[in-house]
Design a protein with these regions (language model features):
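Carboxylate-rich, polar loop motifs that coordinate divalent cations or form catalytic acidic clusters
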Residues: 2, 8-249
């Protein structure tokens, strides 16, 4: 990825190993594997650096993802380093990691994706499954089991979380396909009562071409595109026929 801006403090191409980029208002958050996070003001072309030099309390400069909330907090997912919540006002940091003795701690320390839904809830995708962050108590609601699910635990590595237009949360996982959560359940049921739907790997037109899903996108026509690892792109049409697969060589 390259972005050259005349007169800017740096170019994104100088930050090796970009892991993700997320638009936020009039700017762009760019996460890197080795050099923390950069914020690009698109109007001015100016970069603001968030690393150990500018934010000494930051536990690690290895980052997968970042999501900005309305309260001026930046949620940062680290490479095997847990979750950090950075106050953009005073640069204070709160850091969370997995505690095997605490069932309400972060489920896994490799935080690959963070998603803010339309109700402002913060969902965390980790190497050990899905969690919902409770800002008031600074604890995590973890989703480990699916009632009545013959496939067992929900502790898959999670790569992507998206809320689609039907108010359902679609979750791309490693080897577990797509997990689907109806967000209305979250308002009325206990975590252990919540049921997930699944789209799994199979040989029919209603299954994924590969169980390792990486990315989910819903286009303006309400079609759903799913990127997989080794199985090409899967396309779920808003109108029949439902499934298509594009392979590559």
């Amino acid at each position: 990825i390259r972005l050259s801006l005349v007169g800017s403090e740096m170019c994104i191409r100088d930050s090796t190993h970009i892991t993700s980029s997320v638009q936020a208002g009039k700017g762009l958050w760019v996460c890197t594997y080795y050099r923390g996070i950069e914020y690009l003001d698109i109007a001015t072309g100016k970069f603001t650096h968030y690393n150990k030099s500018t934010v000494p309390a930051l536990p690690s400069e290895q980052t997968w993802t970042a999501t900005e909330a309305e309260d001026g907090k930046l949620y940062i997912g680290h490479v095997e380093g847990g979750l950090s919540i950075l106050s953009l006002n005073d640069k204070s940091v709160k850091h969370f990691v997995h505690d095997p003795q605490n069932p309400n701690s972060l489920p896994g320390n490799d935080v690959r994706c963070i998603y803010k839904d339309t109700n402002g809830n913060i969902w965390i995708g980790t190497s050990k499954g899905l969690a919902l962050f409770n800002a008031n108590t600074e604890t995590f609601t973890n989703f480990h089991n699916n009632p009545g699910n013959i496939h067992g635990a929900l502790s898959s590595y999670i790569f992507s979380i998206k809320q689609l237009k039907d108010n359902k949360l679609w979750i791309a996982t490693e080897l577990n396909g797509i997990m689907i959560l109806d967000l209305q359940q979250n308002q009325f049921l206990l975590p252990e009562q919540i049921r997930f739907e699944f789209i799994r790997e199979g040989d029919n037109n209603y299954s994924l071409s590969n169980a390792s899903a990486r990315y989910i996108f819903q286009d303006s026509f309400n079609n759903i595109w799913i990127g997989t690892w080794g199985g090409g792109i899967n396309f779920i049409s808003n109108a029949p026929p439902a499934f298509h697969t594009w392979s590559y060589s």
